Amino acid sequence: MSQTIDLTLDGLSCGHCVKRVKESLEQRPDVELADVTVTEAHVTGTASADALIETIKQAGYGATLSHPKAKPLTESSIPSEALAAVPHELPVATADEESQQLLLSGMSCASCVTRVQHALQSVPGVTQARVNLAERTALVMGSASAADLVQAVEKAGYGAEAIEDDIKRRERQQETAIATMKRFRWQAIVALAVGIPVMVWGMIGDNMMVTGDNRSLWLAIGLITLAVMVFAGGHFYRNAWKSLLNGTATMDTLVALGTGVAWLYSMSVNLWPQWFPMEARHLYYEASAMIIGLINLGHMLEARARQRSSKALEKLLDLTPPTARVVTEDGEKSVPLADVQPGMLLRLTTGDRVPVDGEITQGEAWLDEAMLTGEPIPQQKGEGDSVHAGTVVQDGSILFRASAVGSHTTLSRIIRMVRQAQSSKPEIGQLADKISAVFVPVVVAIALFSAAIWYFFGPAPQIVYTLVIATTVLIIACPCALGLATPMSIISGVGRAAEFGVLVRDADALQRASTLDTLVFDKTGTLTEGKPQVVAVKTFNGVDEAQALRLAAALEQGSSHPLAHAILEKAGDDKLPQVNGFRTLRGLGVSGEAEGHQLLLGNQALLNEQHVATDDMTAEITAQASQGSTPVLLAIDGKAAALLAVRDPLRSDSIAALERLHNAGYRLVMLTGDNPTTANAIAKEAGIDEVIAGVLPDGKADAIKRLQSQGRQVAMVGDGINDAPALAQADVGIAMGGGSDVAIETAAITLMRHSLMGVADALAISRATLRNMKQNLLGAFIYNSIGIPVAAGILWPFTGTLLNPVVAGAAMALSSITVVSNANRLLRFKPKA
């Protein structure tokens, strides 16, 4: 018997999260219908609550059983026409309390990431945990306490620290990174200072074979090497031991095994040479020291490169000034930023950085918003305009009232989105995760198998060849490069996008954006300025223009439609009559009664439905529509009275931006509620390939579905509340800056500047990021696929040579450095204009 189960959801942050959960539930044979929002799910079918919760967890989110109480429907609870298009299926901003970021230490490779992630996800209350090897951080969603999270990480054998304040956390992260680089540097110097002279001496003078004459000298070198292994390489052995206790294996395990076996063999030969044949008395002390030195050197260079990749987020954090100038009855005073509260009056002068969001109450100024929006040209701001934290006053002086402070400012929201995106993992990275989970055990197995083959079938002295093969295979294998390949590209790509005013919700959005072939644009406010103007008024049946404007404006007083503002503005300051019986006719227009007249105002379909003859207007309707204007028709007492031609001009950069997108190979589609004639005229001017006209607000998502059913990968670009369902339905939703909060929260990508050039920039950066990610993954796979067989001696039958363990150590270090350096190229990426 079917039942409906109500679940409370955790960890969903956008329309695609909703879509993913819905699809996961509806794939179950025992689920008939799943109604999913960002906070809850109502599932009808025969499945049990536990089974549904498990399905949602497998999709990467959290769920608990809920028992909501029914609420009586009142008139005020009925949604408005504008909101009816997006009833309850849209996400809201995730509150700060729902996520915590931890600083991690002790991680060295992708296997460590898997271990820490499992430890965090096992903590009660955690709905999602994202561990980032490149940043050495973990972003944890859910209600678990910081103490529980830190304890779980420490129990897994790693270090963790929870710091709430973004700036303090970043400072701590920088301190740790600098200290780590210094530590790796001196460890590398110490190890190489011992390893290089011994290796050179062996190549030039002594042949590294122990004899009765040099036995004591080699014993001293062995003890010095042991000291190097303890002080310069101790972290490898400590971490390997912790991993062993936790039943896992990491890169440190490979290094510890390789260098440890080489040293133990050498010391055994040194102490008991009589146990070994003469040709097997070769010593490998220099290999242990050199390997530790080279890998530490690689870690130092890698840490330095990783620090460069985090500069974008550091720049955003540095935008907030430490103090603000507050204006009170007693005058002006400088106060710490933490003391500023909403409603306070603040002053800004030339050169000041805006401390919080607010609205200008007095004065004018030019503000540089480049770091926030990517817009290089300073913007003039005056009374009533908004200012945002992080922007800079280039010239002028203003008073403004604080409206959002602390974590509620636009800048804080951007930092939060960038941080979450940098911690996310795309679908392509999941392959690397699966391989990383079994990488180290497989490498150890390959090393043992290869050593066995050389021991039983190799040339004499077998024990020497066995040792070299096992050590080289263990050392050359590099899970570190595999673990860094995806997160380094994401950190650099998301950071670079932020510098262009492009905010990416998660790494999946970047991956999806790189595969798009069709871009759908909402017309009003996206392709156009969103500020329509009445460009012509034509009257009929003896009605004069002033009367037509006055009555039309009176009706539009009750409408929130963008065209209504244009008509009200055209009417000016004239006193407007009172309207009775006002009604909004969805998709048609409005109606009402004023000054004893029955009024209709809307499109031609409205007048036709009300049996108002429009024959006299037909020629003018066609003429205005063909010029790109929207004809708004007025009928008085059942007769056609006037035509108001309203035109919303294209944005200044729309044509250039669309041409740029055309050249990049995208098919461009315009989605609008306008009549086909008007829509086609605008599309022709803008260079649009395809027009979908006459679409009602709640039909936009269906239009996107139809395009997707044709096999297209679709992005929707919009800015209004009624665009939100389409933004969620599209493969990638792109919200224009300055748009509604609902649209921005639904979109996968948000443009901070209201310019279509941002769309081209966003798509170019997404393609570059995915290309970089593939290069890193391919490089890591090729390195290991070639390096491990070569280390195992596959070239011996053809060349008669084996790879030296020292060369293997250098190659391992170089592989990680190469991945990080390649990802850092994204920090210099510039989209082609």
Curated annotation (Swiss-Prot):
Catalytic activity reads: Cu(+)(in) + ATP + H2O = Cu(+)(out) + ADP + phosphate + H(+)
Annotated Cu(+) 1 binding lies at: C14, C17
Domain named HMA is located at 3-64, 98-161
One example of a Gene Ontology biological process annotation: copper ion homeostasis
CDD domains for the chain:
HMA, P-type_ATPase_Cu-like
Keywords from UniProt, A to Z, are:
ATP-binding, Cell inner membrane, Cell membrane, Copper, Copper transport, Cytoplasm, Ion transport, Magnesium, Membrane, Metal-binding, Nucleotide-binding, Phosphoprotein, Repeat, Translocase, Transmembrane, Transmembrane helix, Transport
Q: Which PANTHER family match?
A: ATP7, ISOFORM B, COPPER-EXPORTING P-TYPE ATPASE
The molecule here is called Copper-exporting P-type ATPase
Q: Which organism is it from?
A: Salmonella typhi
Upper lineage ranks? Bacteria, Pseudomonadati, Pseudomonadota, Gammaproteobacteria, Enterobacterales
Q: Which gene encodes it?
A: copA
